[in-house]
Swiss-Prot record:
CDD domains: YlxS_C. The gene is rimP. This is Ribosome maturation factor RimP. GO terms for biological process: ribosomal small subunit assembly; translation. The keyword Cytoplasm applies. Pfam families: DUF150_C (PF17384), RimP_N (PF02576). The lineage of its organism: Bacteria, Bacillati, Bacillota, Bacilli, Bacillales. Belongs to the RimP family. It comes from Oceanobacillus iheyensis (strain DSM 14371 / CIP 107618 / JCM 11309 / KCTC 3954 / HTE831). The keyword Lyase does not apply. One of its GO terms (cellular component) is cytosol. Keywords: Cytoplasm, Ribosome biogenesis. Its main location: cytoplasm. It is found in: Cytoplasm.
Length: 156
């Protein structure tokens, strides 16, 4: 059910975003407690503002009401992905070269399932990161297929 709702929502929101020159980052349909949430994360170069999120929310809400694909009551949320933006697509990794990222793996590489460091390169199949162990810099190559989750990591 969840993946069906996500697919239908993507079909409905894509033309809206293309018209406004916005990017779809992610869609989630999740139950939290008793409530269902349909969350649509959008962005653009230079960041997105609350007015743009509101416009997309109104237009998407109209489209969802027309086709009515969701049987249960839910809350629609349209927002920016935030500063710790998820890296979901290969293009996200290309756009994040030189940035600090956090990666969680399906299985360990060199004894670890989590890495945080600078994304050095991405060739479409392998993520190369530089990370620190105490004061020493190390490098790890991670096959894209082994990445469970990845996001921008903010450091202070």
């Amino acid at each position: 059910m969840s993946s069906h709702v996500v697919s239908l929502t993507e079909e409905l929101v894509t033309p809206i975003l293309e018209e406004k020159n916005l990017e779809l980052v992610d869609i989630e349909y999740v139950k939290e407690g008793k409530n269902w949430f349909l969350r649509v994360y959008i962005d653009k170069e230079g960041g997105i503002d609350i007015m743009e999120c509101g416009e997309v929310s109104e237009l998407l809400s109209e489209k969802l009401d027309e086709s009515d694909p969701i049987t249960e009551a839910y809350f629609l949320e349209v927002s920016s992905p935030g500063v710790e933006r998820p890296l979901k697509k290969k293009e996200d990794f290309d756009a994040s070269i030189g940035k600090n990222i956090f990666v969680k793996l399906y299985e360990p590489i060199d004894g670890s399932k989590e890495y945080e460091g600078t994304l050095q390169s991405f060739d479409g199949e392998t993520v190369t990161m530089e990370y620190k162990v105490k004061t020493r810099k190390k490098q790890v190559e991670i096959p894209y297929s082994k990445i469970a989750k990845a996001r921008i990591a903010v450091t202070f």
